[in-house]
């Protein structure tokens, strides 16, 4: 059964990957951009929708601000990434988690780790939900199955990612470059039409938009709040920075320079695409609202009619070409690039979780060296959590966006603060004037990045707090506490298991027990029991006895009869259990044996069946496993499981285990009966 499960797991996750092979992985910029920067570029597929959705609250007139909001997002992104490029050298050397932990302390580091992991989870949930939205735009009959489509995409993607980074690297660049080619041609053609006045109207341009706040004027405080909310919604276009900065190891040499260029290229492409899409959406009259049945109507005389909204990108493409062919191809390419964006998260999440687990803030099974496929545990964990978020929010991109960006801005802010602090300390001990000038320049640039990132974070949290940002903050705080608890647990384990430095204490820890008592659990006198007896006798303990529990008088009589018939030279002890609780009876017997001689060790030998098929497990009682689990918590007690493989016994029927015959002068074995009375689950000797 184990071999079959191993084959199934290997078929799913692929064969083992040599750590040296993974370390030697190097990506040129043309492959690194699709594999590591797709989550930022693909965000234009839904960032434009979010900007329009927020502005539409104030009516159609507010949509004129959408290109300017996109331009503000692009400028802020260029400033943040332009300053963040100066941090790549420090981040590449040890990773952002280790950098923040060393410069700012333990608690800021776990906050950063939790923020990054949440950002990866939401990248998958948002990208797959957006992909499902494009699929339902192509096939309106699937509108009611959006959540199911998103979950299916996540599951399939998880299986693909379990096959390894190399397979993804060979496939990732095609969808992104096809998407960029189709979208680039569409936007250039659309801009030419807009400048010449030949751009057609979008599908939703003829709809009647009812503002949610009809009495609000587009000036003063309301306008500032509206633009801030739309900026926060579109700030998802800034995602992807941490993935590239933490993946410098995968770039070709010079690694840091190539990573910095890829980072800048990603934000430039994203900014140009976002501004162009929003401009064409405004020129073609694209309208999107959160509740279309209430605030959007195709016929004013019949309100509250169902309207199937299509993404802004799809509507713009349809307005540019006026037919279904190229918009359909662009929608399919968008779905593909959103899938690649999730692949980026599936690369970053396991690496980030592995780096955190290496420092004992997450379970060690998430460490890369502990997994057959190096990152399989992290991939599975990300897939499960992403599915939970997608199902919880019904694959609603607008609802998921409210949780987004908080983690990204938090992690970037902490990293930049750590770098500034590192350079300030370095400046104090630097004497060479040229080196001091260079450090001062770097500190100034990084400080600008800190201020801008902090302003973005405050804006996002302030405008999205009640809409969902509070949930992100709560998740980050809870996960941070879990990380600290995990670290304290591992520290406690290290303290309890560390060998004392004092020689006398170390000698006491390594001292041999006074005596070793072997107890062989016997349920029936069959070959597995005889093998356990043979193993126990071969260990030459100080004393040895067999132990059986009287749950059935007829079975006990059979055990005694066969014991005497085989002349087994081991004393058979019988304990009564009127309430047929085998585990409690054996546990009580072992405890009393330990109590008599606290410095002695008791070794309990447990014969156990090993079956070939999973369904055969159901046919056998799990008494031995329950005994083993209960005895593990007893001090001074060790368990030795003696397996008996049934399938091996079938293939080699001639092998038997015969007891050693006692000498003729040896006294026949005796039976000792310990009567135990069990009252309401408690055991006690009578």
Pin down the residues of each PLM region.
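Extracellular loop-to-transmembrane helix junctions
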Residues: 53-102, 107-113, 126-154, 178, ...
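C-terminal membrane-solvent junction of multi-pass transporters and transport-like membrane proteins
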Residues: 365-377, 412-465
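Cytosolic C-terminal regulatory domains/tails of membrane transporters and channels
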Residues: 1-22, 491-686
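Loop-to-transmembrane helix boundary motifs in multi-pass membrane proteins
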Residues: 28, 106-109, 144-151, 250-273, ...
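Membrane-interface loop-to-helix entry segments
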Residues: 149, 154-196, 203, 262-266, ...
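Extracellular/periplasmic helix-exit of transmembrane alpha-helices
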Residues: 191-201, 261-313
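Hydrophobic alpha-helical segments and their helix-loop junctions in multi-pass secondary transporters
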Residues: 178-211, 278-286, 415-430, 485-494
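Helix-loop-helix junctions that connect adjacent transmembrane segments
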Residues: 177, 181-239, 268, 291, ...
């Amino acid at each position: 059964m184990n071999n079959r499960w191993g084959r199934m797991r290997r078929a799913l996750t692929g064969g083992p990957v040599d750590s040296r092979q993974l370390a030697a992985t190097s990506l040129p910029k043309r492959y690194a951009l699709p594999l590591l920067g797709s989550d930022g570029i693909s965000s234009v597929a839904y960032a434009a929708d979010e900007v329009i959705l927020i502005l539409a609250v104030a009516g159609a007139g507010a949509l004129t601000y959408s290109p300017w909001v996109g331009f503000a997002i692009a400028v802020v992104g260029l400033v943040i990434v332009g300053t963040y490029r100066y941090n790549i050298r420090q981040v590449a050397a040890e990773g952002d988690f280790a950098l923040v932990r060393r410069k700012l302390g333990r608690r800021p580091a776990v906050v950063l780790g939790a923020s990054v992991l949440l950002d990866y989870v939401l990248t998958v949930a948002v990208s797959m939900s957006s992909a499902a939205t494009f699929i339902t735009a192509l096939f309106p009959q699937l509108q009611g199955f959006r959540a199911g489509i998103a979950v299916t995409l996540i599951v399939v993607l998880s299986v693909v990612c379990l096959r390894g980074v190399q397979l993804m690297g060979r496939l990732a660049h095609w969808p992104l470059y096809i998407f960029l080619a189709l979208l680039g041609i569409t936007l250039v053609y659309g801009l030419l039409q807009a400048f010449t006045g030949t751009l057609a109207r979008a599908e939703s341009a003829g709809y009647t938009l009812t503002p949610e706040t009809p009495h609000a004027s587009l000036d003063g405080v309301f306008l500032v709040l509206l633009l801030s909310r739309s900026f926060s919604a579109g700030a998802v276009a800034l995602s992807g920075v941490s993935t590239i900065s933490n993946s410098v190891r995968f770039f070709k040499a010079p690694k840091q320079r190539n990573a910095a260029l890829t980072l800048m290229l990603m934000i430039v492409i994203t900014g140009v695409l976002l501004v162009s899409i929003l401009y064409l959406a405004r020129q073609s009259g694209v309208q999107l609202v959160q509740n279309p049945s209430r605030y959007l109507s195709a016929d004013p005389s019949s309100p509250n009619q169902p309207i199937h909204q299509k993404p802004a990108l799809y509507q713009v493409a349809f307005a540019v070409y006026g037919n279904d062919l190229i918009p359909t191809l662009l929608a399919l390419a968008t779905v593909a690039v959103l899938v690649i964006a999730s692949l980026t998260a599936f690369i970053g999440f396991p690496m980030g979780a592995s780096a955190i687990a290496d420092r004992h803030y997450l379970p060690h099974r998430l460490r890369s060296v502990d997994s057959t496929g190096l990152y399989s545990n992290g991939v599975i964990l990300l897939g499960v959590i992403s599915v939970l978020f997608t199902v919880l929010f019904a694959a609603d991109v607008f609802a998921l966006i409210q949780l987004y960006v908080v983690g990204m801005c938090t992690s970037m802010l902490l990293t930049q603060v750590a770098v500034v602090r590192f350079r300030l300390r370095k400046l104090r001990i630097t004497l060479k004037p040229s080196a001091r000038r260079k450090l001062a320049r770097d500190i100034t640039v990084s400080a600008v990045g800190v201020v801008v990132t902090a302003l973005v974070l405050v804006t996002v949290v302030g405008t999205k707090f009640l809409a969902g940002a509070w949930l992100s903050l709560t998740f980050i705080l809870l996960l941070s506490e879990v990380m600290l608890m995990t670290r304290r647990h591992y520290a406690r384990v290290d303290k309890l298991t560390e060998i004392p430095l004092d020689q006398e204490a170390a000698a006491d820890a390594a001292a041999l027990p006074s005596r070793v008592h072997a107890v062989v659990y016997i349920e029936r006198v069959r070959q597995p029991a005889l093998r356990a007896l043979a193993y126990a006798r071969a260990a030459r303990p100080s004393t040895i006895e067999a132990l059986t529990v009287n749950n059935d008088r007829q079975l006990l009589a059979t055990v005694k009869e066969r014991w005497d018939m085989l002349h087994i030279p081991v004393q058979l002890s019988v304990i009564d259990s009127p309430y047929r609780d085998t585990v409690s009876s054996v546990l009580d017997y072992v405890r009393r044996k330990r109590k008599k001689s606290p410095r002695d060790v008791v070794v309990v030998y447990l014969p156990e069946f090993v079956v070939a098929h999973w369904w055969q497990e159901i046919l056998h009682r799990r008494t031995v496993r329950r005994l083993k689990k209960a005895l593990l918590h007893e001090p001074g007690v060790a368990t030795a499981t003696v397996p008996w493989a049934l399938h091996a016994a079938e293939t080699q029927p001639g092998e038997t285990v015969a007891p050693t015959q006692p000498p003729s002068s040896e006294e026949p074995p005796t039976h000792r009966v310990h009567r135990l009375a069990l009252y309401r689950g408690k055991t006690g000797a009578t």
